[in-house]
């Protein structure tokens, strides 16, 4: 058995105390010096020292002391020292302390009595405890409750010892009498706990005979009652009906802790709708009444579990759950929205959307903290609602369009993506959305939002008035043409500065950015700078949002403007009968495109135009100069069809994910069927009937069958030594979120007893041992289990290595068996996750740690290699299947996963097929921490060749 520590004392390792110094201080008369010496002795014991020479000194000079602090430290010392020899027999000198303990138990001071009784709770040696039993019993009748409550705990601990029931034969009966007469709440709780632990039937009888008084009992006693109920119902499930009534009565208790435990107990014991509804209501009430954010997060976790198991009941409480949005904490709000979005139905969608709209309006005030981020969460939630239930889109789309000009770019981007999807899925809203978009387009200031808004204008302006308004809006936002004066460009800069004052403009710095398909391009990050005004037409920077963005060097936007104008002109040909008007508009569009090219090639622009944007604008110019039916069809129909296909694929993916979440359970054909209507209902309450029905349903559908998956358990066993070694060892590794539990089975294969056998472990990486190794004795050809816990603090590949050290009677030297290394796999800590394209790009730009792994594989098919990497890294591919379908010689995809510590792992895979059939390219891993980037890179390097 591992020894448990009951205390934690700081110890400064830099100044170890010497045993002789401690001995001198203990022999003196100075009380403070004795206290200090006792503390040093205890610290040495805690750190593995034995110091046996101090025992007699302490018996002679410390034991007689009347000082309370010294007496308390003495008990700590006695708890720590070894009281038995190697054979497990009590050391003879330990009898010396019995008389002192007896005196303490009869001491006139109640504190001395109480701490001595508490000390006896931790004594495991029957020989020491046995002479003290009469004195312990006398303390049950002491006038002070502190003594009585510790006396009850001491009796319980002694009764639980091997043969302890012989020391206190009638202990349960005695404690039951104490329970009926005791007035102190803590002593009463301890008495009930003793009955529950040592004589469960008596505890049950006492509880059932006092059912009406349970709600008036003390909080600590009510908590033990709930613990008893859980224990009894586990062994006797048929009787849980009468206990559930007690739990429901406790739901009205004044203590939040009791109410929370009641709800948890109800859920664990019953599947009846009434019980689940009561538990869910309790969690919702606590969610509103508790101010601690950690408590709120725990309650939301409980509600999430209920939502998973009992969605139909949780649907009724969706508005109660949403009230948690009143908390200013973003984590609480995010969890609340995640739960609520899974509970939306046709019946509650309008109510939910109204509540979300109110929250969006609240974010417009400057009072709330992190308004932009919260607004973004709300917009995403409303987007999800509108996609599931298109009928509500009309009530929210116009409200959200007010935020297209939001200073929070991510929030504005979410709005424009929402509008783009709604205008396609809700054709009835097309006219009103286009009208509103054209009216508010000038407010959009973000370079990432404008292209999407322009695409919507180009695709969905269908009537003559809409097309003309679209062209007019774009022209106004571009301002006067050209973008700079050619004549003024050649003038000396010094003269120019005197003629006109300088104007500030937005200039961009460029850095690599990952596109939607996973390839790299250049991203412009706007920053303010100054231009000489003579080269820029006066007033140009304030005349329109598109103009301001173009002057920063954002020529990707210029290419989008050209494409949008091209689509609008081509559509104008279809709806405008006057050729003169069409030609006039064509000329205007060509002038705009040529001006953008001119700006891109001039020294006025902070950056020259990139080749992609230049070629795109040139294509638009050629198309407007030489229009034909085939190209017209591609521009006006094919682009829209691609978007429709993308939306359909997204909806299909979401449906598949929803189906995957829904776990189906199956019953065996020969399972018994219990017909509810043929059962006796006599004396059963409605709740008991409901509970029985739910149990029958679960049994019928196979939900009671739990597959322990023993084969998987066997796969986790690692052999640590060879079969020919004198000591054979194997470990079963259980990986938890924050620690690793090792269960090492050690077998003595020799004919001798192994003494002082010790499992010595060490770690490499971000792993830490949390306990000191213990010494054991192992009989010939016997086995034992040694447990070790290792703390994990980050997602990083670690190694556990060590030895088994032992002694035998024949050989004086210690024998060492070296163990095989245990490698802790990063895959145990990361799981596939989903995030939006925008969130992926944002994280990719922010994360500083990148690990670039060159592709080196024997696999020759791009898609096969991607699937192999996904399987090897336990990540989710965010790139749509249509984007990586087909054979084109190259492939780019984004992968995403999340660790149990909340760390994000981003992977971009870019590969190309060479002429000889081999694959080349790079896999880039980015994360906020170095550990996950390096560990994942090592894993990919190991696995990419197609190894297991």
From Swiss-Prot:
Keyword Repeat in annotation: yes
UniProt subcellular location: Cytoplasm; Golgi apparatus membrane; Cytoplasmic vesicle, COPI-coated vesicle membrane
An example Gene Ontology molecular-function term: structural molecule activity
InterPro entries: ARM-like, ARM-type_fold, Clathrin/coatomer_adapt-like_N, Coatomer_bsu_C, COPB1, COPB1_appendage_platform_dom
One biological process term in Gene Ontology: vesicle-mediated transport
Record keywords, A-Z: Cytoplasm, Cytoplasmic vesicle, ER-Golgi transport, Golgi apparatus, Membrane, Protein transport, Repeat, Transport
GO cellular component: COPI vesicle coat; Golgi membrane; plasma membrane
The keyword Repeat is assigned to this record: yes
HEAT repeat extents: 49-87, 92-126, 127-164, 274-311, 312-349, 391-428
Membrane topology reported for the UniProt record: Peripheral membrane protein
Function text: The coatomer is a cytosolic protein complex that binds to dilysine motifs and reversibly associates with Golgi non-clathrin-coated vesicles, which further mediate biosynthetic protein transport from the ER, via the Golgi up to the trans Golgi network. Coatomer complex is required for budding from Golgi membranes, and is essential for the retrograde Golgi-to-ER transport of dilysine-tagged proteins.
Subunit (UniProt): Oligomeric complex that consists of at least the alpha, beta, beta', gamma, delta, epsilon and zeta subunits.
Name of the protein in question: Coatomer subunit beta-2
């Amino acid at each position: 058995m591992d020894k448990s520590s009951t205390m934690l004392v700081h110890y400064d390792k830099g100044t170890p105390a010497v045993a002789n110094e401690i001995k001198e201080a203990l022999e003196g008369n100075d009380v403070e010096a004795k206290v200090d010496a006792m503390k040093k002795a205890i610290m040495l014991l805690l750190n593995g020292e034995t110091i046996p020479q101090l025992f007699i000194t302490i018996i002679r000079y410390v034991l007689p002391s009347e000082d309370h602090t010294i007496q308390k430290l003495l008990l700590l010392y006695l708890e720590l020292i070894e009281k038995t020899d190697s054979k497990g027999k009590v050391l003879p000198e330990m009898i010396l302390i019995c008389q002192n303990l007896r005196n303490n138990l009869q001491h006139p001071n109640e504190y001395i009595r109480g701490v001595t009784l508490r000390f006896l709770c931790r004594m495991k040696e029957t020989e020491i405890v046995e002479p003290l039993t009469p004195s312990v019993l006398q303390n049950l009748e002491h006038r002070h409750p502190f003594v009585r409550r510790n006396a009850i705990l001491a009796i319980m601990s002694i009764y639980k010892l091997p043969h302890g029931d012989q020391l206190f034969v009638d202990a349960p009966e005695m404690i039951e009498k104490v329970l009926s007469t005791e007035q102190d709440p803590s002593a009463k709780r301890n008495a009930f706990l003793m009955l529950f632990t040592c004589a469960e039937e008596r505890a049950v009888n006492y509880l059932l005979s006092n059912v009406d008084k349970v709600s008036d009992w003390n909080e600590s006693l009510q908590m033990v009652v709930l613990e008893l109920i859980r224990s009894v119902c586990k062994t006797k499930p048929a009787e849980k009906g009468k206990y559930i009534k007690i739990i429901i009565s406790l739901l009205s208790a004044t203590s939040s802790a009791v109410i929370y435990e009641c709800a948890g107990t109800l859920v664990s014991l019953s599947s009846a709708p009434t019980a689940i509804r009561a538990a869910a209501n309790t969690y919702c009430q606590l969610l509103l009444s508790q101010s601690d954010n950690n408590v709120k997060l725990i309650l939301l976790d409980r509600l999430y579990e209920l939502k998973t198991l009992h969605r139909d009941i949780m649907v009724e409480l969706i508005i109660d759950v949403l009230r948690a949005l009143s908390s200013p904490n973003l984590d609480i709000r995010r969890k609340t929205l995640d739960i609520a979005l899974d509970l939306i139905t046709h019946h509650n969608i309008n109510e939910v959307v109204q509540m979300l709209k109110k929250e969006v309006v609240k974010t417009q005030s400057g009072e709330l903290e992190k308004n932009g981020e919260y607004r973004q969460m709300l917009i995403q939630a409303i987007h999800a609602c509108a996609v599931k239930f298109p009928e509500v889109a009309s009530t929210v789309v116009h409200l959200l369009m007010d935020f297209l000009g939001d200073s929070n770019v991510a929030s504005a981007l979410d709005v424009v993506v929402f509008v783009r999807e709604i205008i396609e899925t809700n054709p009835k809203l097309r006219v009103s959305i286009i009208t509103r978009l054209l009216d508010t387009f000038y407010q959009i200031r973000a370079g990432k939002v404008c292209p999407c808004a322009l695409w919507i204008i180009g695709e969905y302006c269908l009537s003559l008035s809409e097309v003309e308004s679209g062209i007019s809006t774009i022209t106004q936002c571009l301002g006067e043409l050209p973008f700079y004066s050619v004549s003024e460009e050649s003038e000396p800069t010094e003269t120019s500065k005197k003629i006109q004052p300088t104007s500030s403009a937005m200039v961009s710095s460029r850095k690599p950015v990952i596109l939607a398909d996973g390839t790299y391009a250049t991203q412009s990050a706007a920053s303010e700078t100054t231009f000489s005004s003579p080269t820029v037409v006066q007033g140009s920077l304030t005349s329109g949002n598109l103009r301001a963005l173009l002057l920063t060097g954002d020529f990707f936007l210029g290419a989008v403007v050209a494409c949008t104008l091209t689509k609008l002109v081509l559509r104008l040909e279809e709806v405008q009968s006057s050729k003169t008007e069409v030609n006039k508009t064509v000329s205007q569009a060509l002038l705009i495109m040529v001006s953008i090219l001119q700006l891109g090639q001039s020294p006025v622009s902070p950056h020259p135009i990139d080749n992609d944007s230049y070629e795109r604008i040139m294509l638009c110019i050629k198309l407007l100069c030489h229009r034909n039916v085939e190209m017209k069809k591609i521009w006006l129909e094919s682009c829209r069809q691609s978007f429709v296909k993308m939306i359909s694929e997204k909806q299909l993916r979401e449906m598949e994910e929803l189906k995957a979440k829904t776990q189906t359970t199956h019953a065996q054909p020969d399972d018994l069927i219990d017909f509810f209507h043929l059962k006796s209902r006599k004396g059963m309450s409605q709740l008991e009937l409901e509970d029985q029905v739910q149990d029958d349903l679960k049994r019928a559908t196979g939900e009671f069958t739990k597959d322990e998956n023993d084969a998987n358990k066997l796969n986790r066993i690692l052999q640590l030594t060879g079969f020919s070694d004198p000591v054979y060892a194997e470990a079963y590794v259980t990986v938890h979120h924050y620690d690793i539990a090792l269960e090492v089975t050690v077998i003595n294969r020799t004919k001798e007893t192994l003494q002082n056998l010790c499992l010595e472990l060490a770690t490499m990486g971000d792993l830490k041992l949390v306990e000191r190794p213990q010494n054991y004795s192992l009989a010939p050809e016997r086995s034992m289990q040694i447990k070790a816990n290792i703390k994990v603090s980050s997602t990083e590949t670690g190694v556990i290595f060590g030895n088994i050290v032992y002694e035998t009677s024949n050989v004086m030297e210690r024998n060492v068996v070296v163990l095989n290394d245990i490698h802790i796999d990063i895959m145990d800590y990361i799981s596939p996750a989903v995030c939006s394209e925008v969130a992926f790009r944002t994280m990719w730009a922010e994360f500083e740690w990148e690990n670039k792994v060159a592709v080196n594989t024997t696999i020759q098919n791009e898609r096969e290699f991607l699937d192999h990497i996904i399987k090897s890294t336990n990540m989710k591919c965010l790139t749509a299947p249509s984007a990586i379908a087909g054979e084109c010689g190259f492939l780019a995809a984004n992968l995403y996963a999340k660790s149990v510590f909340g760390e994000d792992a981003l992977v971009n895979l870019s590969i190309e097929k060479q002429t000889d059939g081999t694959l080349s390219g790079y896999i880039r891993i980015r994360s906020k921490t170095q550990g996950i980037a390096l560990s994942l890179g090592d894993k990919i390097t190991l696995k990419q060749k197609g190894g297991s």
